[in-house]
Regions:
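Sec-dependent signal peptide hydrophobic core
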Residues: 1-3, 36
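C-terminal motif of bacterial Sec signal peptides marking the signal peptidase cleavage site
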Residues: 5-7
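Solvent-exposed helix-loop boundary motif
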Residues: 10-21, 25-112
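Flexible coil segments in periplasmic/lumen-exposed cytochrome c-class electron-transfer proteins
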Residues: 108, 112, 120-125
Length: 125
């Protein structure tokens, strides 16, 4: 599902520490498009109904309950550790099914990109 580098310069807003906060655009291009939004995975109609294509990911993730794990919210703005998406990407204990992306887990840098975006508020840019 998720791969590649951290956000390139100019792809995020300045955070309170003077660093760059990832944007949905950077997460979309570096994670979702690169590792998730394929015809066999999360392109329309999407595995488990989850579509992570351009223009669909934010509304499919933010404050949305998991279809596979009722009660688990996919993305909780400001709370990456509590977000089921991050738990699935990390392969945390208690997830339903497999770590994502199946068979090709993301590297730590790409997971951190998603974590940073969520912790920064998971804005739709």
């Amino acid at each position: 599902m998720i791969l590649l580098l951290l956000a390139c310069s100019g792809t995020g807003a300045t955070d309170s520490k003077g660093g760059t906060s990832p944007t949905l655009s950077s997460v979309q291009s570096e994670v979702f498009n690169a590792s998730c939004a394929f015809s066999t995975c999360h392109a329309a109609p999407g595995a488990s109904g989850l579509v992570l294509e351009d223009g669909s990911a934010w509304s499919a993730l933010v404050t949305v309950e998991s279809a596979d794990n009722p009660g688990a919210i996919l993305v909780i703005p400001g709370d990456a550790n509590g977000s089921y998406l991050v738990q699935k990407l990390r392969g945390d204990a208690g997830i339903v099914g497999d770590e994502m992306p199946a068979g090709n887990p993301l590297d730590a840098e790409r997971i951190q990109l998603v974590v940073d975006w969520i912790d920064a508020g998971a804005a739709d840019d």
